[in-house]
Amino acid sequence: MIRADGRRPDELRQVTILRGWQEHAEGSALISAGRTRVLCAASVTTGVPRWRKGSGLGWVTAEYSMLPRATDTRNDRESVRGRISGRTHEISRLIGRSLRACIDLKALGENTIAIDCDVLLADGGTRTAAITGAYVALVDAARWLGRPDAIITSVSAVSVGVVKGEAMLDLAYSEDSTADTDMNVVCTGADGFVEVQGTAEGTPFDRTMLDSLLDLAVRGCAQLTAIQTEALRGPVPAGPPRPGGAR
């Protein structure tokens, strides 16, 4: 089955990751997955939340948001509405959990890295793109801090689903909105699962289909890991002055 955008069922959208896109951040990356674009910025602060002080452990957290015209019709900013939606809270926590799976918080020391993931354009897979891009920003932030060894593995994420009875990788919005099953899978570079979120929208899926979807996701994440590795191969963007005033 050939999809509307010409891809095979097991094919990712074109993915690019541009590092250093936001020059004031200690680490940043603009990730594009098809038409979906997410800006991920990592900010380093000395110290940890009050409940973490004295533990010798660092902290990594994340916030997710979507620009008003990231979608085809305008959505008010949640700050204007006066409340953060449950979806936004859920995705922010998912990104944070995923990133903490790839870092040694003891090696980070009592420092905090906060990752802001802002969706510039949404065409499906925004949370998975955010995780994949946020990892790259996190690596550069750890390097900036002088603690590159705190990163112990990579992490990436991709969506899979069942559309018209067929398992598909990396769903665009038109596919996601009509899928019989929608699943988001977060994997480490060692093929470990960090999180699997899957829902049957109508017809339940069986164990055979579940295995097919997970196999697709693992292969997709392996390709994303290779893209992350290539993006991180170049020199570290200068960013703001490093601790001690040096760049």
From Swiss-Prot:
Its EC number is 2.7.7.56. Phosphate binds at residues 87, 125-127. InterPro entries: ExoRNase_PH_dom1, ExoRNase_PH_dom2, ExoRNase_PH_dom2_sf, PNPase/RNase_PH_dom_sf, Ribosomal_Su5_D2-typ_SF, RNase_PH, RNase_PH_bac-type. It is an enzyme of class 2 (transferase). GO terms for molecular function: 3'-5'-RNA exonuclease activity; tRNA binding; tRNA nucleotidyltransferase activity. Keywords: Nucleotidyltransferase, RNA-binding, rRNA processing, Transferase, tRNA processing, tRNA-binding. One of its GO terms (biological process) is tRNA processing. It holds the Pfam family RNase_PH. It catalyses: tRNA(n+1) + phosphate = tRNA(n) + a ribonucleoside 5'-diphosphate. Phosphorolytic 3'-5' exoribonuclease that plays an important role in tRNA 3'-end maturation. Removes nucleotide residues following the 3'-CCA terminus of tRNAs; can also add nucleotides to the ends of RNA molecules by using nucleoside diphosphates as substrates, but this may not be physiologically important. Probably plays a role in initiation of 16S rRNA degradation (leading to ribosome degradation) during starvation. Belongs to the RNase PH family. Homohexameric ring arranged as a trimer of dimers. This is Ribonuclease PH.
